[in-house]
């Protein structure tokens, strides 16, 4: 960046708890370029516009909400940037291979009909409306960046559409090859590589990364043997490339021959495609008819939100409707540390264990810790929670990579056989949770548990305060538990 001329610098922002890091980034660019050339936007900036104005140069342009008109950037047109396809080429600027890179990222709607107090969507996208033509999005991405195997949709609440609207959406998705019969056949990788190399300017980071990946791929294919003519020709071309100082130019000169040779050996195996409504579905709006429509496309996993125990019956009914139409893989988001009590988290996870067993389906839960959208850190502690409980929930989830599987034995081991056991686990030393097997085998966990259960309610509450606030205690029984 240093020593180069830039007309503008655009800085995006993510979550509000990254506030300090974002401001630090903005200030670092203030030192390198005139503030008039800096534009900031994104989620955090949209939610905290007034606050961030106090912390940065007032000459910086602050853009909030959706970018639906390019004229606000001072450009000479009025393009709705928000509906433009994503730029997949940025994935080539890094060596890391993004796990979801083989997905069409798209959305059909913005906004949500619900106005949940814990959610930022009503502020960021205040109106629920259909915005994008899914067919055009997918075709444009395919033409510019190559075909993708799966479809990942980022709609906040797809079930807010009427049955007629949902019917049209599903028909469009089917027309793109995302039905339960059509298989995906991956094109020859060299064609993808060459398309990228032609698009990028030479000597860019992306060009260098793709060239390196292409050469590695071609090197692996040197073992081809079926056709002696093709084998000899391939090795001849590879020799030219490997000996040349301008490997990219030699690659371009022999592109057609290389593709012809590798196409001869290319035998792609058809694989199932998947549609993922990644933001989850609203169980309150899932009807039998809407599920019948959705069942025509290969949704995997089927994501349902379970934000409160008060929706237990609604959630269970929705999951049963989906299972009736053949869905066997479920995933859900479970909000905690909001208005809920710890036992309500246990109860919701237990509901999933029971439903998985009853319906013979797979349900993977993702507990999501609530963080208020007006805070700049992740230190919020819910009314019925404390720091100790939250640390131990994190310890449990850290062992499982954030996923709670539906197996009964696993669930009882991690979260306890009942609410009482769950509270004991939440109160344990963090090491006892993280290294559960070790401390159970040497008997220390059982010893600690016995002593904890002998405490009065008042003593248990004091212990949790001591652990949460890192203070001392004069109670000898508590000191014994604290080690």
Please identify what each model-predicted range represents.
Residues 1-101:
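Glycine-rich beta-alpha loop elements in corrinoid/cobalamin-binding modules
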Residues 6-10, 60, 117, 149, ...:
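Conserved acidic residues
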Residues 31-38, 58, 273, 326-328, ...:
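A short helix->loop->beta-strand "cap" motif at the edges of active sites that frequently abuts
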Residues 98-136, 145-147, 160:
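Canonical Radical SAM [4Fe-4S] cluster-binding loop centered on the CxxxCxxC motif
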Residues 280, 292-457:
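A structural motif corresponding to the C-terminal lobe/cap of the Radical SAM core domain
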Residues 454-483:
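C-terminal non-catalytic accessory extensions
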């Amino acid at each position: 960046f240093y020593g180069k001329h830039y007309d503008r610098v655009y800085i995006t922002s993510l979550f509000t708890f990254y506030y300090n890091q974002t401001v630090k980034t903005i200030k670092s660019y203030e030192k390198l370029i005139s503030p008039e050339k800096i534009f900031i936007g994104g989620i955090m900036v949209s939610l905290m516009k007034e606050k961030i104005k106090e912390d940065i140069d007032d000459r910086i342009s602050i853009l909030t909400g959706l970018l639906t008109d390019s004229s606000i950037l001072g450009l000479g047109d009025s393009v709705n940037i928000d509906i433009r396809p994503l730029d997949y080429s940025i994935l080539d600027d890094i060596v890391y291979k993004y796990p979801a890179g083989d997905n069409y990222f798209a959305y059909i709607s913005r906004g949500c009909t619900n106005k949940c107090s814990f959610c930022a969507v009503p502020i960021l996208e205040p109106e629920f409306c259909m915005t994008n033509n899914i067919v055009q999005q997918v075709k444009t991405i395919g033409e510019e960046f190559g075909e993708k195997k799966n479809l990942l949709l980022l709609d906040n609440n797809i079930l807010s559409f009427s049955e007629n609207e949902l019917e049209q959406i599903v028909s469009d998705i089917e027309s793109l090859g995302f039905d339960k019969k059509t298989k995906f056949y991956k094109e020859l990788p060299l064609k993808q590589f060459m398309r990228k190399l032609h698009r990028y300017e030479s000597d860019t980071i992306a060009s260098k990364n793709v060239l390196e990946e292409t050469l590695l791929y071609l090197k692996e294919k040197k073992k081809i043997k079926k056709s002696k003519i093709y084998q000899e020709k391939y090795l001849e071309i590879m020799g030219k490339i490997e000996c040349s100082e301008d490997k990219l130019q030699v690659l371009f000169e022999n592109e057609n021959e290389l593709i012809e040779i590798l196409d001869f050996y290319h035998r792609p195996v058809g694989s199932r495609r998947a549609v993922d409504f990644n933001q989850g579905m609203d169980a309150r709006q899932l009807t039998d008819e809407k599920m019948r429509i959705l069942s025509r496309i290969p949704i995997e996993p089927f994501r349902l939100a379970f934000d409160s125990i008060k929706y237990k019956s609604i959630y269970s009914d929705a999951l049963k409707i989906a299972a009736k139409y053949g869905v066997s893989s479920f995933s859900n988001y479970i909000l905690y540390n909001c208005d809920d009590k710890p036992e309500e988290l246990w109860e919701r996870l237990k509901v999933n264990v029971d439903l998985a067993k009853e319906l013979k389906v797979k349900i993977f839960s993702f507990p999501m810790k609530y963080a208020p959208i007006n805070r700049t850190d992740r230190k919020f502690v819910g009314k019925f929670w404390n720091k100790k409980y939250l640390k131990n929930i994190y310890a449990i989830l850290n062992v499982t990579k954030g996923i709670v599987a539906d197996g009964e034995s696993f669930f009882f081991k991690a979260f306890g056989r009942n609410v009482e056991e769950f509270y004991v686990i939440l109160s344990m030393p963090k090491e006892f949770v993280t290294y559960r097997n070790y401390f159970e085998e040497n008997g220390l966990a059982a010893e600690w548990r016995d002593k904890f259960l002998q405490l009065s309610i008042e003593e248990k509450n004091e212990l949790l305060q001591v652990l949460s606030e890192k203070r001392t205690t004069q109670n000898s029984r508590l000191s014994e538990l604290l080690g």
